[in-house]
Amino acid sequence: MFALASMTTSGDEALNARYKESVSLSVGLCESLPEQFKLIETPINSFLLVANVMPNDDRPWDSHPASGADFHNIRMPRLERLRALIRCDRGYNNGKGGEAGQRAGEDDERMDEGVPEEGAPRSPHPPPFAHYEVYDSWSWQRALRVDKDDVIREAVAELAKPANWQGTAVEDPLPLMWLLFYGRRSFCDDPECLYRARFGHPGPLLLPNYMYRPAEDASSFLAGLCRCVRSVYGCEFGGGSHVNPAQVPFDHGRFSEALRKLGAVDDAGAYVSRQCLVCRLYRQNLMSRGIIGGRGSSIVLGGSGKKYLTREVGTRRCLELGDIALYPSYDISLILDDLEASDGLRQ
C-alpha cells in the first residue's frame, strides 16, 4: 500500500501523508464496525469506503406485509409540489399553457379542479408558498406614498412599446391602474390604521413587489394589475362606490369596459391584503414578540430598510414544509418620521 501511495502521489510528501492517513482511518473503521463499513480496492489504484446505511432486516423469513394496509393518509408535501410543477411544465411544453392575462385551457382547469389526466381524483395542490416578501428600497418607498403618479407614468411609457402587449386580454389598462392606486377600496381599511393616525388618511394597500417597478417587467406588471384589480374590485364598475368622479381625469365609461374584460382573466387565486405596509409591519412586530399568532409571509425591507430593524426577531415553524421562518421587527415610528420628512406629509 505504501509503495502504491508513493507512486500515486508522485513524491508529494504532504499528499502522501494524507493518503496514508485516510487509508489507515478507513481500515480502522472497517475493523471496528465490520457490518457497517467495507473497504474495497478498485482497479484504478484507489480505495472505496462503502457504508451500509440500511437497517438490518430481522423479520422472519416467512413473514409478509399485513393484508389491508392503508397508506392513503400519508402525505409527502414536497413530492406533491414537485409533481405539480412537473405537470405544469409538461402542459406548457405541449402548448397548453395560457398566456398572461388570459384564462387557462381545459387541461389547466382540470388540474385546478383536482382531477389528473388518468381520471383518478386527487387533492388540489395549493399555490407555492414563500416565507418572505422582499421589497427593495425603491418598492417599499413607493408602497408608502399615496401619490402613485410616477408608477402610472412609468407603466404608460413601457406599455407604449408594442412588444409589451403580447399575450394579454387587456385593451385599456389606464382605468385599471387608476382603480388600483386611487380607487376608494385601494386604501387600508384597518380601523386602527397607524398611517391614518399619523397623516389623517389611510395608507395605500400593500401590493406585490413587481407592481411598483413596471419598467423592469411590464408583462408581469400588466398581469398583476389584472389579478389585483379583480381581487379588490371584481368585474363590475360600482360608480361612486369605486372612485371619486371629480378626481378621474378621463371618461368614466372606460371603467365599465375595462372591468368587464377582466371576466376573461384567470386571477390564479390572487389575494390582496386590505392593509397598508405600515399596518402589515405592525402586525409582524406583534408576531415577532409573540404577542399574537398568525401565519403568512414575512415582509423584509431591503436596501436602506435595514436601518429600521430592531432587535426582536420571531420564528415560526412551517408545518407543511418543516422550515423555520423568521419574523423581523421594524421601528415604525422612525419609518413614518422619515416619510413625513421626505414627502412633507402633514395631518
UniProtKB/Swiss-Prot annotation:
Q: Which InterPro entries match?
A: Herpes_UL95
Read off the Pfam families from this record. Herpes_UL95
Which parts of the sequence are annotated with region: Disordered?
A: 95-126
Q: Where is the composition biased (Acidic residues)?
A: 106-116
Organism superkingdom = Viruses
Family statement: Belongs to the herpesviridae UL95 family.
Instruction: State the name under which the record lists this protein.
Output: Gene 34 protein
